[in-house]
């Protein structure tokens, strides 16, 4: 979804600035959008030499509450999840130049099947995910990787499976990426210097326990 249908440039800039401030608060290191990051004292899982996650963003600053109420985000989640959704977690992937997830691209599905064989899938709208791009997404810049049609397989990929079919999800800063939880997704390694930032809002059915401990 293009930036003009998501939020104003002013909101985007404020969100980016807020995420960088939280990076500093949690790592003890200064962050510059044009320079590679540092993990510092911060420890979170999953974590690589060129990426970490910021958790519990909803309570970190009022701007994330405003984002949760964004009309475009909510309209798309209502469509995908038939109005049954609740916020499960709000995080930010802080990524910089490096190998990232390696050759597998970290491909996975957010929706796990009800059986190991994947014959009886979970409901189509048990989970859906979204990525608000705070920087440009290109393959060289470490964009998301998705495997078209993989949501029809109703299972997790085997190690290395799907890499040859993965395509980059390229988008301008301010764009919103929305996807069903069943599609295999990960990310390409970032080849360029500087940060790739986002805010990921993950939604689940109200029958499921949320990832973040919301009350």
Enumerate the language-model features and the residues they cover.
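Extended serine/threonine-enriched, polar tracts that run as long, contiguous segments within proteins
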Residues: 165-185
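Non-heme Fe(II)/2-oxoglutarate
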Residues: 28, 176, 183-184, 188-215
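Non-heme Fe(II)-dependent double-stranded beta-helix
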Residues: 3-115
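A short, structured loop/turn motif at beta-sheet edges
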Residues: 8-10, 172-175, 207
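A structural signal for short, well-ordered beta-strand segments
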Residues: 89-92, 130-132, 199-203
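Active-site rim elements
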Residues: 61-66, 164-167, 186-188
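Short hydrophobic-aromatic micro-motifs
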Residues: 2, 132, 177-179
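Catalytic core of non-heme Fe(II) oxygenases with the double-stranded beta-helix
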Residues: 75-76, 99-171, 208-214
């Amino acid at each position: 979804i293009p930036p003009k249908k998501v939020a104003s440039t002013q909101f985007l800039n404020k969100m980016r600035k807020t995420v960088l401030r939280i990076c500093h608060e949690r790592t003890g290191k200064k962050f510059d959008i044009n320079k590679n990051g540092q993990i510092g004292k911060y420890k979170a899982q999953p974590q690589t030499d060129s990426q970490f996650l910021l958790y519990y963003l909803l309570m970190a600053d009022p701007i994330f509450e405003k984002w949760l109420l964004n009309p475009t985000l909510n309209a798309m989640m209502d469509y995908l999840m038939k109005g049954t959704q609740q916020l499960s977690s709000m995080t930010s992937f802080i990524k910089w130049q490096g190998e990232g997830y390696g050759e597998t691209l970290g491909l996975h599905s957010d929706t796990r099947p009800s059986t190991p064989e994947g014959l009886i899938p979970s409901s189509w709208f048990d989970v859906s995910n979204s990525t608000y791009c705070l920087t440009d997404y290109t393959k060289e810049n470490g964009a998301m990787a998705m495997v078209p049609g993989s949501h029809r397989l109703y299972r997790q990929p085997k190690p290395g499976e799907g890499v040859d079919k993965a395509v980059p999800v390229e988008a301008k800063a301010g764009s919103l990426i929305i996807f069903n939880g069943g599609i295999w997704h990960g990310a390409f390694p970032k080849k360029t210097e500087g940060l790739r930032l986002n805010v990921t809002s993950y939604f689940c059915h109200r029958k499921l326990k949320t990832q973040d401990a919301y009350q």
